[in-house]
Each structure stands twice: as C-alpha cells, then as structure tokens.
C-alpha cells in the first residue's frame, strides 16, 4: 500500500496543523518523539503512543522495541490487530522501503477487514538507531482513509529519535 508512504510526500505540499505537542516515548526510557493533534486524542501505551482520527476511521500507534526483539514485536502487532477484529488478506501483502526523516522506513501493507468493513492495514519499521526501532501500526477504514492521509503524513513527518 503505497498510500502508507504517500502521506510523507503529501506533507511536503501541505500546511502545518495545530499539534498537541511533542510526545517523547516510552516514558521510562525515551527513544523517540512524535507530534499528534489534540483531536486525535493521543494516549500513552506501555511502549509508545497511539491516536485515532476524529472520525474514528484511522488508528495509528508508535511503539519502541530493541532491534533483536523484532519477531516478538511483529507477533504482538498481529495479536493486537486480531484482538481488535482486524483481519489482513495475506494475498494483498505489499512491502516497500523508503526513508523517513533520514531514517530507514520499511512498510508492510495489506487490505483487510474489521467489524465495520474494508480497511487498509500497515506496519512500519523505522530504524531510530542501531539498537532501537519504532513500530508504526496503522489501520484505516477505506471509506475515510483518503480524508485522513494528509494528517497521517504530518504525524509521520514529526517522528524523530529522542535527544
């Protein structure tokens, strides 16, 4: 789903919106910062931060893991999606590699379904450092995805390693 990477390009031609401020996460061992608008109701999680678009059609989360924990992280991501009724169509899987703010950004995308109907699903793996990665989990209703993509791009563009 190149639509997951497209927000980064869209960001370059869009204006800035009001952000809630910068979230540094995880709280106990900061590894990254990201800005999420207030109306996305950002909340901290055990390993990061998450938010939902105002129309509840798009979910995005950022979690931190050690590079050697990648297999467990991916298992946890799929367990989370399953717990939330999100099912990916394996035949629709697409992978891509790009750069985001100078960091390697690998995405795996699928089409799928949730309790409300068709969705787009994305998992992004961003290399913050040799030891730490950020995992971006994304799912969006196909009905509202295009409307929320510009904001997703702006959120992604704020992701940086913590100083």
Residue ranges and their predicted role:
Residues 1-8:
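Bacterial N-terminal signal peptides that target proteins for export
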Residues 16-20:
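Sec/Tat signal peptide C-region and signal peptidase I cleavage site
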Residues 29-78:
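Secretory pathway targeting signatures of secreted, lumenal, and periplasmic proteins
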Residues 29-30, 67-70, 119, 145-152:
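Solvent-exposed, acidic/flexible segments
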Residues 38-40, 134-163:
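Surface-exposed amphipathic alpha-helical segments
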Residues 44, 81-88, 156-163:
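Sec/Tat-exported extracytoplasmic proteins
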Residues 61, 107, 135-137:
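Structural recognition of the beta-strand scaffold that forms the well-ordered cores
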Residues 82-129:
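Signature of long, low-cysteine stretches enriched in small and polar/charged residues
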């Amino acid at each position: 789903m190149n639509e997951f990477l497209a927000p980064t390009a869209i960001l370059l031609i869009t204006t800035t919106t009001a952000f809630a401020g910068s979230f540094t996460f995880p709280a106990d061992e900061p590894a990254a910062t990201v800005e999420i608008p207030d109306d996305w109701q950002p909340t901290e999680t055990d390993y990061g931060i998450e938010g939902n678009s105002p129309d509840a059609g798009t979910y995005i989360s950022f979690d931190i893991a050690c590079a050697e924990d990648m297999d467990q992280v991916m298992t946890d991501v799929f367990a989370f999606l399953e717990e939330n009724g999100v099912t990916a169509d394996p035949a629709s899987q697409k992978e891509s590699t790009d750069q985001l703010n100078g960091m390697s950004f690998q995405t795996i995308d699928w089409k799928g379904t949730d309790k409300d109907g068709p969705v787009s699903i994305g998992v992004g793996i961003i290399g913050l450092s040799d030891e730490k990665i950020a995992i971006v989990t994304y799912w969006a209703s196909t009905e509202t995805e295009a409307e929320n993509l510009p904001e997703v791009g702006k959120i992604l563009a704020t992701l940086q390693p913590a100083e």
